[in-house]
Amino acid sequence: MNSNPFSDTTIRKIERFQWWHQRRTKLIFIILIILTILIISLSLILKFVILKPSKSKITTTTTTTTTTTTTTTTSYQQYVWRDTGNLVNARYRHAASVLNDGRVLITGGLGSTYQLRTAELYDPSAGNWTLTGNMNIEREFHTSSTLTNGKVLVVGGEASRGYQNTAELYDPSTGVWTVTDSLEYARSEHAATVLLDGKILITGGYNGRDYLDSAELFDISTETWRNTTSMNSGREHHTASLLQDGRVLVVGGSDSRTAELYDPLTEAWKYTGNMTIGRQSHTATVLANGKVLVVGGSHDPTSRAELYDPTTETWTVINGPKDIRFDHTASVLTNGQVLIAGGYAVDDLITTELYDPSTGNWIITGNMSHTRTDHIAATLLNGNVLVAGGYDRGAKNTAELYEPL
């Protein structure tokens, strides 16, 4: 007699249930293992690929000749460029100054067909541009300097009525421009340097006939100009950099490879070694260690860069950026690196590169959204770099931000 209380059919159902239950348990266990592997894999991808754009791919190239061996190391990094608000007026050959409150003042430049006297303010907190008061005279190839009292001094340039010796002061608190004392000499494509005592040194430039060697000083307490000692060479499209000891280094211009030092205490100029090539429309950037990095130029277009050491007053050729360029911009980042952006070579450039003074290497970083030359670049108080305007088959009104990681 069968003592099992379940029928054969019921027993088979129970056995099938147990078999499916065991199989389902195994399947669930396998699926959980697969999901765990996928989650770990995705985490690694996010960590090392997507969220680590600053990791560099480094390429080292060694070139040997009978006399020299040059090693060039290039890294590749992706940083963040993003569009910000457009300028109200498209422009190039304009000027920019960072105000004490963090806003950026853009002045003048060349529009689609003529010089501009309009001025605009960029607000980093809102990411937009607004018109402010117009200058009294339209200008391109002028200079713009933020003074120690917070006002902005705009000097010289080229206008429809000719080369300018005029100057204007902008008051950010009122948005009003005021004509101030005029320079003795009209000039454009000159350089302006804010000295340690607050005075403004104007050097060189072009007046339609000659490359100028003259220099003038603006006293903000009296708002007047006076002549200072002239440079040893006439120059335009040169650079003038304030060194840490208060002297001013003037480099290149007018296809020159010469450099001069100005001492504000004695108001004397002296030559200080020659670069290896002539440069104009280049950039010169004072590094945290006090040296000056010179990049690019249009006389002998080259990727070769040079470093000036103020302590020894000597020049050294160093590794250069990948791209030959001039009419570009150079901006010092908060980490001490130098951002080179845009410019012109065979065509207008979209590329950007970083120079790392700690290693002497160049880093190819992400491209801008727009090609541009004759633009401006301003380092904001938050460390970002604003690039605005410029030329690319016409005046541009676009602006973008570089955000270091």
Give, region by region, the residue ranges found by the protein language model.
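Intrinsically disordered cytoplasmic terminal tails of membrane proteins
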Residues: 1-25, 57-67
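Alpha-helical transmembrane segments in eukaryotic/viral proteins
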Residues: 28-59
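Kelch-like beta-propeller repeat domains
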Residues: 46, 71-405
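Intrinsically disordered, low-complexity regions
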Residues: 3, 8-17, 42, 46-47, ...
